[in-house]
């Protein structure tokens, strides 16, 4: 059980949302220029990005605006044929993937060993950590930061894989308070349930993770991370629950997900205390530490601010390679990120003449 430890002492696809840029290294342009390979070398060939995505993910991510900008910047996206050996395809500069399964993971690990010069986004072993909600938030709970302009923790939660009739007793032993958010153990599923009373708990279907519901004013902050870049958008979320709700509601309320792209809250008329974004320094240090600990460069964090506070935040979920198509201006952020990988680890390859996948 993650006990909801705090951090610091100081302060799962549609629609477009207004951009809120919150993090970029101040001297990013100077650093990029200093690290960049000779312009002639970059122009000599395209940057080839092989992608292995589900058809749904490919459609939402590889939108025309991304493909068009990528072509202008010399980036070519090529579909990977999962039925053929990876070594027989390419050559690739970068492999971008979001597939699960032991067979794919083994193929990719073997490819990484044979082609260490290719950047794989991200290592399969690191991705595994975010696919299981029992362990997903452990790194957040173990962070020990100081002077980060706020406190970050995780709600109390309990892993349940037992007979449903025994769940109320397990919840009581763990010291969790109702209502509880029930989440499937496997993070691929976005369906959530809210249980208001002990009887409701017996209607749940393990294995799952139970998480204390924290009132947060009905607003959630989606923090998108692409390498060193951070973007934040506000989304409408579940409303606050008061004592009256606990008394008058019973049963299990199911939700397809806590937030959705159509529920963008950036332009809504919100209480300023609810709408205020988490402090930039807090997000920067949190993202940096999670990148280091998780070994990932493409993920997002779902954060909430405890209602009635200004500096107490909770991370309630994380996702690998989230729906970047919903992130404002994602095509610019993502193409810049891909080019930065070449600037840091530039290696000359034969030209690639195949058509886009």
UniProtKB/Swiss-Prot annotation:
Keyword check for Signal: no
Amino-acid positions noted as binding 1D-myo-inositol 1,3,4-trisphosphate in the UniProt annotation, renumbered to this chain: 56, 98, 190, 222, 319
GO molecular function, one term: ATP binding
Annotated cofactor note: Binds 2 magnesium ions per subunit.
Enzyme Commission (EC) number: 2.7.1.134, 2.7.1.159
Residues given in the record as ATP binding sites: 133, 183, 211-222, 237, 262
GO cellular component: cytoplasm
Substrates-to-products reaction catalysed: 1D-myo-inositol 3,4,5,6-tetrakisphosphate + ATP = 1D-myo-inositol 1,3,4,5,6-pentakisphosphate + ADP + H(+); 1D-myo-inositol 1,3,4-trisphosphate + ATP = 1D-myo-inositol 1,3,4,5-tetrakisphosphate + ADP + H(+); 1D-myo-inositol 1,3,4-trisphosphate + ATP = 1D-myo-inositol 1,3,4,6-tetrakisphosphate + ADP + H(+)
Alphabetical list of Pfam families matching this protein: Ins134_P3_kin, Ins134_P3_kin_N
Chain sites annotated for binding Mg(2+) 1: 302, 317
Swiss-Prot/TrEMBL keywords: ATP-binding, Kinase, Magnesium, Metal-binding, Nucleotide-binding, Transferase
Primary enzyme class: transferase
Binding site for Mg(2+) 2: 317, 319
Cofactor(s) listed: Mg(2+)
GO biological process assignments: inositol trisphosphate metabolic process
Family the entry assigns: Belongs to the ITPK1 family.
Function per UniProt: Kinase that can phosphorylate various inositol polyphosphate such as Ins(3,4,5,6)P4 or Ins(1,3,4)P3 and participates in phytic acid biosynthesis in developing seeds. Phytic acid is the primary storage form of phosphorus in cereal grains and other plant seeds.
Quaternary state and interactors: Monomer.
Name of the protein this chain belongs to: Inositol-tetrakisphosphate 1-kinase 3
Organism listed in the record: Oryza sativa subsp. indica
Gene name of the encoded protein: ITPK3
């Amino acid at each position: 059980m993650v006990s909801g430890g705090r951090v610091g002492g100081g302060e799962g696809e549609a629609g477009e949302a207004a951009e809120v840029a919150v993090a970029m290294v101040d001297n990013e342009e100077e650093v990029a220029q200093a690290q960049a390979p000779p312009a002639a070398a970059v122009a000599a060939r395209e940057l080839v990005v092989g992608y292995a995505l589900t058809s749904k993910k490919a459609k939402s991510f590889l939108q025309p605006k991304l493909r068009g900008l990528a072509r202008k910047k010399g980036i070519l996206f090529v579909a990977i044929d999962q039925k053929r050996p990876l070594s027989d395809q390419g050559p690739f500069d970068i492999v971008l993937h979001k597939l699960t399964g032991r067979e794919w993971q083994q193929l990719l690990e073997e490819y990484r060993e044979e082609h260490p010069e290719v950047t794989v986004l991200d290592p399969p072993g690191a991705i595994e950590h975010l696919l299981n909600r029992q362990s997903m938030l452990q790194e957040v709970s173990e962070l020990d930061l100081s002077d980060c302009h706020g406190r970050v923790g995780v709600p109390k939660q309990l892993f349940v894989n037992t007979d449903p009739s025994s769940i109320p007793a397990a919840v009581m032993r763990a010291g969790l308070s109702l209502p509880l958010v029930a989440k499937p153990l496997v993070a691929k599923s976005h369906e959530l349930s809210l249980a208001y009373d002990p009887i409701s708990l017996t209607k749940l279907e393990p294995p799952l993770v139970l998480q204390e519901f924290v009132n947060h004013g009905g607003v959630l902050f989606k923090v998108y991370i692409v390498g060193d870049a951070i973007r934040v958008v506000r989304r409408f979320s579940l409303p606050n629950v008061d004592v009256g709700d606990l008394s008058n509601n019973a049963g299990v309320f199911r939700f397809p997900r806590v937030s959705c792209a159509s529920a963008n809250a950036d332009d809504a008329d919100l209480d300023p205390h609810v709408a205020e974004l988490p402090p930039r320094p807090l997000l920067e240090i949190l993202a940096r530490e999670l990148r280091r600990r998780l070994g990932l460069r493409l993920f997002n964090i779902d954060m909430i601010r405890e209602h009635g506070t200004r500096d107490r935040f909770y991370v309630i979920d994380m996702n690998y390679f989230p729906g970047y198509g919903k992130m404002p201006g994602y095509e610019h952020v993502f193409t810049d990120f891909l080019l930065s990988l070449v600037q840091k680890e530039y290696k000359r390859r034969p030209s690639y003449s195949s058509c886009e996948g």
